[in-house]
Regions:
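Bacterial N-terminal signal peptides that target proteins for export
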Residues: 1-7
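Non-globular targeting/processing and membrane-anchoring segments
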Residues: 161-164
Length: 164
């Protein structure tokens, strides 16, 4: 009897250790634009990134810290991963936990080039890529390349001051 109880306990513990990560939400260009529009009244930063992108991984701690400090000040952030949709649920969540990312992260559910073209005709699909939206939902700036906490802070402050 004792052996049976130990076997059951071991199987339960083993089962709990292999519970799958929750599935990350998928998005296409239209869905993302609708999500951005739902945040009217806030400044919105959209960050396109991937776990295979060195500069993306380097800037992630700054992005996470920026969001923690600015979410109460009317800033929303949305991360969009270009990781392969088939493996994103295994590769992305550990990176988000390790970097204490609290903002929503979505995974592109279509061809990256098509996504980039539908989201912004001028974007070639490079990452990291950022888009800044004012409180009315208007896109006011787009840029590519590794971005620091100080750069995000300056962009948001400039936008908030110019819209007063």
């Amino acid at each position: 009897m004792r052996m049976r109880w130990l076997l059951c306990a071991a199987l339960m513990a083993l089962g709990m250790s292999v519970i799958a990560e929750p599935r990350l939400p998928r998005t296409n260009a239209r869905d993302l634009q609708q999500r951005i529009a739902r945040h009217k009244g806030k400044v919105v930063i959209v960050n396109f990134w991937a776990t295979w992108c060195g500069p993306c991984m380097e800037e992630l701690p700054d992005l996470a810290r920026f969001y923690r400090n600015y979410k109460a000040r009317g800033v929303e952030m949305i991360g969009v991963s270009f990781d392969d949709e088939e493996t994103a649920d295994q590769t992305v969540p550990p990176v988000l936990r390790r970097n204490r990312v609290e903002y929503p992260v979505l995974v592109v559910k279509q061809n990256f080039d098509q996504f980039a073209d539908r989201f912004d005709k001028e974007w070639r699909g490079e990452v990291p890529r950022f888009y800044l939206y004012d409180k009315s939902g208007k896109r006011v700036k787009a840029w590519s390349g590794k971005t620091s906490y100080a750069t995000l802070e300056a962009e948001v402050r400039r936008l908030q001051q110019s819209r007063r």
